[in-house]
């Protein structure tokens, strides 16, 4: 700030500021709009920049987003690199070593190549960082009781602070703009994002200066509002000015967060959503035995045409291989644990979400102080489980609507640790699936998680049920209860059902069948998540944006190829003890033909007549009704007609009698004896 003609008393710099309302900063995404799990580990780099937006200091760590708030300790002179000319470092690039020559101690000749005596007084016209002597005097200023420095916010300041100016005034054009620093009046703020102070005590700084090093380190700490802000990826700026007599020199600096581990970007081009729809690969034929090492005389060995040292990347599995591997893995796991159910059955893939379901289990997780490798892997964080059964271990603030899934709820774990789920399990959180949890995220958010086993939504049907669905005239009174793979195998990794089927937990997890199912689920989940990502970034028609259509297209692709039989909304594969049958549609036709022949062989000639002549059945059912009605009329019609005629005659006679009665009067009868007696 420009100094007035008279001296600046301390009270001029302690003007009371107007009361400010606390700004509520919402937990929304600023510079980065991410939809991944909050527990996902990223490579985070906090950078301190100079006025030219060049990075002069940085610190890197692997942590979840918005959970790592380290102390930033750049040197004050580092902020002046490529800065204003009065700092003396305008021609030195970032990350330059401290310029010399060193500072003399008492006698100028005591240090070889020294420039000035360390005890000479500092003037306001001297550069601040270009020599060891200037850096030592700068340390004296920043630690002096009546001097120091103050910091003013730039880009994120409120509207009333427009009078604070811009970068040309280091955002400190008027008093009251300062929010932090190391000054006598102790500037503070309830809304600024950082606090700035010295990182070395007054006795420590001169020693570092005399050794020709950076000796004015600052310590920048994030405040509560700063930790709630999520706009650090775009960066924020501040201005810093020294509080000395005369003109207050200053500079500007910025702080930003760089996130370098966001995964690959999808270029604009052909939509890759449906590019992997390929038929299943044919089984590899058995290779012939290798020829003997002996070669005919004079016949030199032919060198191989290909380079055996060149690694070949295996092609990505298409729709056919991916879904068939998923059903094959389900069959192997079911056949190993319960062989009686795989004598003859149908395993069906559903076309409607959810495609996976979870079984809550109890297990012991492992706690790590540093992020393990699987915590930084981009697991299925876009996928959520809408169907979870059972009771298991829960973490976080579980709402009442989901407490039925918790057999044991652990309180919130303090500290900054990483909780890794046991092998074969995942954490099903309100934000998605993840193999690793961050206790910092659980403490800062309302996220909650349940330890679950993940099983594909594969429906088990007995063969009799499937055949009757394709046979005409056979209907169940009610729909049978569908058994899924989760109900048949749920809890195996934690030993829940394994003890009942006589299979140890360790043995099951280590078996090749279970590993094959886990690998198939991982590949399918990866494909589904990639489909979601591609659909989110797709620039084509909106008809591709429905995930259900994607899985429906996959199953339709298998159905049209004859690989599965369509049963309602499911795509079913036939399986028995010989294994999974790929040509399931042909197998279904074969089984239906066998059942039809067996049914016909047990029928009589009359029943067979109806089966062999479908038109006869239609004709009889059409004319049978009218014939029966006509026969009834011929049998009972005359009798009914006679009774009706007799009834009509009787009624007519009664009417005639009534009419005659009304026309004539009845004469009174006279007894002759009574007449004679009167006379």
From Swiss-Prot:
Highest taxon in the source lineage: Eukaryota
Location of the region described as Disordered in the Swiss-Prot/TrEMBL record: 268-321
InterPro entries, A to Z: FMuLV_rcpt-bd, TLV/ENV_coat_polyprotein
PANTHER family the UniProt entry points to: BC035947 PROTEIN-RELATED, VIRAL ENVELOPE PROTEIN
Protein name: Retrovirus-related Env polyprotein from Fv-4 locus
Residue spans of biased composition, Pro residues class: 280-293, 301-314
Pfam family, one: TLV_coat
CDD domains: HTLV-1-like_HR1-HR2
């Amino acid at each position: 700030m420009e100094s007035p003609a008279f001296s600046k008393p301390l009270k001029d710099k302690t003007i009371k500021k107007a009361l400010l309302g606390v700004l509520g900063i919402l937990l929304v995404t600023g510079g980065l709009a991410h939809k991944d799990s909050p527990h996902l580990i990223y490579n985070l780099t906090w950078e301190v920049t100079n006025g030219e937006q060049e990075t002069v200091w940085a610190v890197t760590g692997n942590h979840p987003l918005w959970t790592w708030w380290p102390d930033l300790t750049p040197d004050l002179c580092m902020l002046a690199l490529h800065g204003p000319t009065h700092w003396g470092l305008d021609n030195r690039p970032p990350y330059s070593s401290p310029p010399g020559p060193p500072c003399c101690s008492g006698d100028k000749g005591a240090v070889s190549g020294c420039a000035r005596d360390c005890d000479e007084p500092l003037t306001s016209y001297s550069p601040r960082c270009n020599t060891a002597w200037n850096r030592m005097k700068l340390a004296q200023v920043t630690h002096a009781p009546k001097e120091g420095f103050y910091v003013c916010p730039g880009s994120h300041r409120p509207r009333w602070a427009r009078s604070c100016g811009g970068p040309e005034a280091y955002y400190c054009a008027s008093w009251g703009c300062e929010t932090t620093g190391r000054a006598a009046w102790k500037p503070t703020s309830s809304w600024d994002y950082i606090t700035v102070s010295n990182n070395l005590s007054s006795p420590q700084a001169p020693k570092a200066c005399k050794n020709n090093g950076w000796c004015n380190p600052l310590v920048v700490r994030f405040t509560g509002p700063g930790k709630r802000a999520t706009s650090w990826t775009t960066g924020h700026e501040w201005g810093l000015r020294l509080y000395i007599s005369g003109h207050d020199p200053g500079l500007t600096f910025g702080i930003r967060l760089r996130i370098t581990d966001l995964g690959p970007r999808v270029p604009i081009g052909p939509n890759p959503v449906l590019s992997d729809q390929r038929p299943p690969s044919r089984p590899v034929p058995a290779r012939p035995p290798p020829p003997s090492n002996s070669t005919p005389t004079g016949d030199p060995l032919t060198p191989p045409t290909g380079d055996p040292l060149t690694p070949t990347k295996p092609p990505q599995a298409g729709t056919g291989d991916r879904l068939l591997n998923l059903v094959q893995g389900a069959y192997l796991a079911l056949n190993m644990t319960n062989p009686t159910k795989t004598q003859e059955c149908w395993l069906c893939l559903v076309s409607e979400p959810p495609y996976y379901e979870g079984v809550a289990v109890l297990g012991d997780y492992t706690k790590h102080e540093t992020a393990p490798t699987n915590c930084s892997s981009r697991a299925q964080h876009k996928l959520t489980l809408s169907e979870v059964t059972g009771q298991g271990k829960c973490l976080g603030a579980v709402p009442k609507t989901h407490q039925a899934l918790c057999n044991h709820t652990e309180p919130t774990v303090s500290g900054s640790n990483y909780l890794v789920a046991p092998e074969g399990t995942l954490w099903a959180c309100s934000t998605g699936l993840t193999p690793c949890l961050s206790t910092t995220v659980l403490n800062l958010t309302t996220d909650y998680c349940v330890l679950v086993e993940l099983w594909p939504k594969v429906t088990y049907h007995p063969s009799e049920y499937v055949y009757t669905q394709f046979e005409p005239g056979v209907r169940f009174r009610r729909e049978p209860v569908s058994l899924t793979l989760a109900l048949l195998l749920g809890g195996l990794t934690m030993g829940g059902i394994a003890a009942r089927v006589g299979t140890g937990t360790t043995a099951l997890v280590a078996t090749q069948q279970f590993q094959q199912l886990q690998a198939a689920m991982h590949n399918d989940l990866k494909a589904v998540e990639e489909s979601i990502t591609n659909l989110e970034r797709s620039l084509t028609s909106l008809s591709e944006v429905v995930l259900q259509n994607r899985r429906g297209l996959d199953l339709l692709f298998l159905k049209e190829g004859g690989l599965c039989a369509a049963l309602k909304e499911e795509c079913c594969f036939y399986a028995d003890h010989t294994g999974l049958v790929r040509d399931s549609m042909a197998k279904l036709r074969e089984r239906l033909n066998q059942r039809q022949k067996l049914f016909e062989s047990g029928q009589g000639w009359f029943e067979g007549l109806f089966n062999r002549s479908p038109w006869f059945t239609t004709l009889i059912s059409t004319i049978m009704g009218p014939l029966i009605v006509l026969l009834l009329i011929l049998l009972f019609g005359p009798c009914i007609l006679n009774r009706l005629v007799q009834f009509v005659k009787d009624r007519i006679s009664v009417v005639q009698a009534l009419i005659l009665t009304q026309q004539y009067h009845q004469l009174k009868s006279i007894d002759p004896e009574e007449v004679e007696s009167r006379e």
